[in-house]
Amino acid sequence: MTFSRLIAAVGLLFLLSAVTQPAAADAFGTKDEAVALVKRAIARTAEIGMDKAKVEFMDHEGKFIDRDLYVVVMAKDGVRIVQPASPKLVGKVFFDAVDVNGKEYGKDVQQIAAGPGKGWVSYAFKDPVSGKILPKEVYIETAGDYIYLAGVYVR
Protein backbone atom coordinates (compact mmCIF):
# COMPACT_ATOMS: atom_id res chain seq x y z
CA MET A 1 0.00 0.00 0.00
CA THR A 2 1.44 3.34 -0.97
CA PHE A 3 1.73 6.17 1.48
CA SER A 4 -0.99 8.22 -0.25
CA ARG A 5 -3.40 5.27 -0.10
CA LEU A 6 -2.63 4.78 3.58
CA ILE A 7 -3.35 8.46 4.27
CA ALA A 8 -6.59 8.20 2.27
CA ALA A 9 -7.66 5.08 4.18
CA VAL A 10 -6.92 6.69 7.55
CA GLY A 11 -8.79 9.82 6.46
CA LEU A 12 -11.78 7.75 5.38
CA LEU A 13 -11.85 5.89 8.70
CA PHE A 14 -11.68 9.19 10.57
CA LEU A 15 -14.51 10.63 8.49
CA LEU A 16 -16.69 7.54 9.00
CA SER A 17 -16.12 7.55 12.75
CA ALA A 18 -17.08 11.22 12.93
CA VAL A 19 -20.30 10.54 11.01
CA THR A 20 -21.33 7.55 13.14
CA GLN A 21 -20.57 9.11 16.53
CA PRO A 22 -23.33 11.22 18.09
CA ALA A 23 -22.52 14.87 18.55
CA ALA A 24 -21.72 15.89 22.11
CA ALA A 25 -24.98 17.84 22.29
CA ASP A 26 -26.88 14.67 21.42
CA ALA A 27 -25.52 12.99 24.53
CA PHE A 28 -27.94 14.95 26.71
CA GLY A 29 -31.67 15.57 26.62
CA THR A 30 -33.22 18.92 25.78
CA LYS A 31 -36.09 20.84 27.32
CA ASP A 32 -38.31 19.96 24.36
CA GLU A 33 -37.45 16.28 24.81
CA ALA A 34 -38.26 16.49 28.54
CA VAL A 35 -41.70 17.92 27.76
CA ALA A 36 -42.28 15.25 25.10
CA LEU A 37 -41.23 12.50 27.55
CA VAL A 38 -43.71 13.72 30.16
CA LYS A 39 -46.49 13.87 27.58
CA ARG A 40 -45.68 10.33 26.38
CA ALA A 41 -45.73 9.09 29.98
CA ILE A 42 -49.12 10.72 30.59
CA ALA A 43 -50.51 9.13 27.42
CA ARG A 44 -49.08 5.73 28.35
CA THR A 45 -50.61 5.90 31.82
CA ALA A 46 -54.00 6.76 30.30
CA GLU A 47 -53.61 3.82 27.92
CA ILE A 48 -52.55 1.02 30.30
CA GLY A 49 -52.96 2.38 33.85
CA MET A 50 -50.32 3.36 36.39
CA ASP A 51 -49.64 -0.16 37.70
CA LYS A 52 -48.40 -1.31 34.28
CA ALA A 53 -46.97 2.05 33.21
CA LYS A 54 -44.72 2.40 36.25
CA VAL A 55 -43.00 -0.87 35.35
CA GLU A 56 -42.24 0.56 31.91
CA PHE A 57 -41.11 3.91 33.38
CA MET A 58 -38.60 2.15 35.67
CA ASP A 59 -37.19 -0.09 32.89
CA HIS A 60 -33.68 1.13 32.05
CA GLU A 61 -33.88 -0.71 28.71
CA GLY A 62 -37.32 0.68 27.90
CA LYS A 63 -38.74 3.70 26.09
CA PHE A 64 -38.98 6.07 29.04
CA ILE A 65 -35.30 6.41 29.89
CA ASP A 66 -33.28 8.17 27.21
CA ARG A 67 -29.69 9.24 27.89
CA ASP A 68 -30.00 11.52 30.93
CA LEU A 69 -33.79 11.88 30.58
CA TYR A 70 -36.24 9.88 32.64
CA VAL A 71 -39.71 10.44 34.00
CA VAL A 72 -40.52 10.79 37.70
CA VAL A 73 -44.11 10.27 38.80
CA MET A 74 -45.66 11.08 42.13
CA ALA A 75 -49.09 11.05 43.68
CA LYS A 76 -50.78 14.39 44.35
CA ASP A 77 -49.48 14.25 47.94
CA GLY A 78 -45.91 14.25 46.61
CA VAL A 79 -45.09 10.61 47.32
CA ARG A 80 -42.88 9.25 44.54
CA ILE A 81 -44.32 6.33 42.60
CA VAL A 82 -41.63 6.23 39.90
CA GLN A 83 -38.00 7.33 40.31
CA PRO A 84 -35.75 5.33 37.96
CA ALA A 85 -32.53 7.21 38.77
CA SER A 86 -32.89 6.47 42.51
CA PRO A 87 -35.39 3.66 43.13
CA LYS A 88 -34.77 3.95 46.88
CA LEU A 89 -36.69 7.25 46.73
CA VAL A 90 -39.92 5.53 45.66
CA GLY A 91 -42.34 6.01 48.55
CA LYS A 92 -40.59 9.17 49.76
CA VAL A 93 -42.15 12.64 49.62
CA PHE A 94 -40.76 14.84 46.84
CA PHE A 95 -42.21 18.11 48.13
CA ASP A 96 -39.55 18.15 50.89
CA ALA A 97 -36.70 18.27 48.33
CA VAL A 98 -34.02 20.94 48.90
CA ASP A 99 -31.07 21.58 46.58
CA VAL A 100 -27.42 22.06 47.60
CA ASN A 101 -27.98 25.83 47.88
CA GLY A 102 -30.91 25.43 50.26
CA LYS A 103 -33.60 26.13 47.65
CA GLU A 104 -36.79 24.26 48.52
CA TYR A 105 -37.54 23.27 44.95
CA GLY A 106 -39.91 20.51 46.05
CA LYS A 107 -42.28 23.21 47.29
CA ASP A 108 -41.98 25.01 43.95
CA VAL A 109 -43.01 21.79 42.20
CA GLN A 110 -45.93 21.45 44.63
CA GLN A 111 -47.11 24.99 43.84
CA ILE A 112 -47.04 24.39 40.09
CA ALA A 113 -48.83 21.05 40.45
CA ALA A 114 -51.55 22.62 42.63
CA GLY A 115 -51.79 25.83 40.59
CA PRO A 116 -51.40 26.00 36.83
CA GLY A 117 -50.78 22.25 36.55
CA LYS A 118 -47.70 22.57 34.36
CA GLY A 119 -44.51 24.58 34.27
CA TRP A 120 -40.78 24.62 34.99
CA VAL A 121 -38.72 24.74 38.19
CA SER A 122 -34.99 25.50 38.36
CA TYR A 123 -32.58 24.26 41.02
CA ALA A 124 -29.02 23.00 41.45
CA PHE A 125 -28.23 19.29 41.43
CA LYS A 126 -25.24 16.98 41.08
CA ASP A 127 -24.82 15.93 37.47
CA PRO A 128 -24.15 12.17 37.42
CA VAL A 129 -22.06 12.51 34.24
CA SER A 130 -19.61 15.23 35.31
CA GLY A 131 -20.00 14.92 39.09
CA LYS A 132 -20.37 18.71 39.24
CA ILE A 133 -23.22 20.71 40.71
CA LEU A 134 -25.10 22.14 37.73
CA PRO A 135 -28.29 24.10 37.20
CA LYS A 136 -31.18 21.77 36.44
CA GLU A 137 -34.62 22.56 35.10
CA VAL A 138 -37.53 20.19 35.57
CA TYR A 139 -40.79 20.20 33.65
CA ILE A 140 -43.88 19.41 35.71
CA GLU A 141 -47.30 18.42 34.43
CA THR A 142 -50.28 17.18 36.40
CA ALA A 143 -52.65 14.67 34.81
CA GLY A 144 -55.39 12.79 36.60
CA ASP A 145 -54.18 11.67 40.02
CA TYR A 146 -50.49 12.07 39.22
CA ILE A 147 -47.71 14.61 38.83
CA TYR A 148 -45.13 13.86 36.11
CA LEU A 149 -41.64 15.37 35.92
CA ALA A 150 -38.64 15.20 33.61
CA GLY A 151 -35.57 17.39 33.95
CA VAL A 152 -32.53 18.54 32.05
CA TYR A 153 -29.17 19.84 33.18
CA VAL A 154 -28.21 23.27 31.92
CA ARG A 155 -24.79 22.66 30.38
Regions found by a protein language model. Give the residues of each.
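N-terminal membrane-sensor/transducer module of prokaryotic signaling receptors
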Residues: T2-L15, T20-R155
